Amino acid sequence: MKLRTKAKALRGRLRVPGDKSISHRAVIFGAIAEGQTVIHGLLRGQDVLATIQAFRDLGVTIYEAADSLIIEGRGFKGLKPAQKPLDMGNSGTSMRLLAGLLAAQDFSVQLLGDDSLSRRPMDRITIPLSLMGAELSGQGEKELPPLIVKGCQELRPIHYQLPVASAQVKSAILLAALQTQGETVILEKELTRNHTEEMIEQFGGKLSIAGKQISIKGPQRLQGQILQIPGDISSAAFWLAAGLIVPGSDLVLENVGINPTRTGLLEVIEKMGGQLSYQAVDKDIQSASLRVSYSSLKGVEISGDLIPRLIDELPVIALLATQAQGTTYIRNAQELRVKETDRIQAVTDVLGQMGADIQATEDGMVIRGKTPLHGAAVSTCGDHRIGMMTAIAALLVEEGQVTLERAEAILTSYPDFFKDLERLWHD
């Protein structure tokens, strides 16, 4: 598709879709809790829809109400064997978390994914789950999908140190541990998003957290809840970037989640000199309205324990860096290479073709700014975040046309992205 270029200014107020990470977990915990769960603000992107369909296939009643999703929870022991493989689509979160949950069930199931998901390593979950006594098998050394999860009613607790900073791996272990007799202890390499831990407590479960160590005793029973999901900071990130780099822009993003494990982007914006302010802070659901306006930015270094707190925002941070004076260094971000695509290479290719001075490294990128961007024919590589980054980059293009192949990938997390762009466009 052809992308809009030559933006004069983006102005207005916008409410971004519900948080994708929290939406997945809300559906999962609603299904395994006892009683009814009502979810407001759920993201209805393709990834979350895959999770919903998986639980329907496992016998859970899920239906739409006027402004909510209602789940009639069946408890851990109420899931039924699926009559067909569970299709996770493009969703690594769905596959990894469901593998942990289903590892303790008394039936077997096959988890499938699309071409992109079928290239993503699952050994990072099969190893700890196997230590718990689960039987899982994928393809090759990295246990690539399809993934077969064989039923195992009696898992054993483990003490496990995560070799990578991954909330998905942590969550898979926690979902298995909730069904396991005894105490499981997880030691994180770096602190990662804590939505699973928060949701366990929200549904009436118990666990203890001391620094990077999480301890949980099972088995536990969970109770259905009424949930309000804030807007996704990872989706808001693209509009925050647009507001900062498109001259004349002034945007307010309403009801954005500001869980501290996810706000690394906001710290980077402030470090780069961006004009950012918080409004209407709601501490109960950890949300706020964020206002940004066009700013003169400067290059920064991004590395270390900050990386897990902005891992999904690094593509759009790289775009910000192309419009910042000086050099930006992104380090310790090798996890980007095993996302929906190799995001280090994809970001470097797309922005490089558009004229950016950007270089890929083994674990990150080096970006020198400020550089003008020009038209190019590029692809999302099937990655929604690459697609949205490109659409924001195109706004700065004064010469040439930007064409984007496989733009449908954006439906994964933000079905109304281009509609929202039109709402903010000012000639």
Curated annotation (Swiss-Prot):
Taxonomy of the source species: Bacteria, Bacillati, Bacillota, Bacilli, Lactobacillales
The name this protein goes by in its record: 3-phosphoshikimate 1-carboxyvinyltransferase
Naturally occurring in which organism (per UniProt): Streptococcus equi subsp. zooepidemicus (strain H70)
Gene3D superfamilies reported for this sequence: Enolpyruvate transferase domain
Transmembrane segments annotated in the record for this chain: none
Positions that bind 3-phosphoshikimate: K20, S21, R25, S166, Q168, D312, K339
Pfam families according to UniProt: EPSP_synthase
HAMAP family: EPSP_synth
Pathway as given in its UniProt record: Metabolic intermediate biosynthesis; chorismate biosynthesis; chorismate from D-erythrose 4-phosphate and phosphoenolpyruvate: step 6/7
Family the UniProt entry places it in: Belongs to the EPSP synthase family.
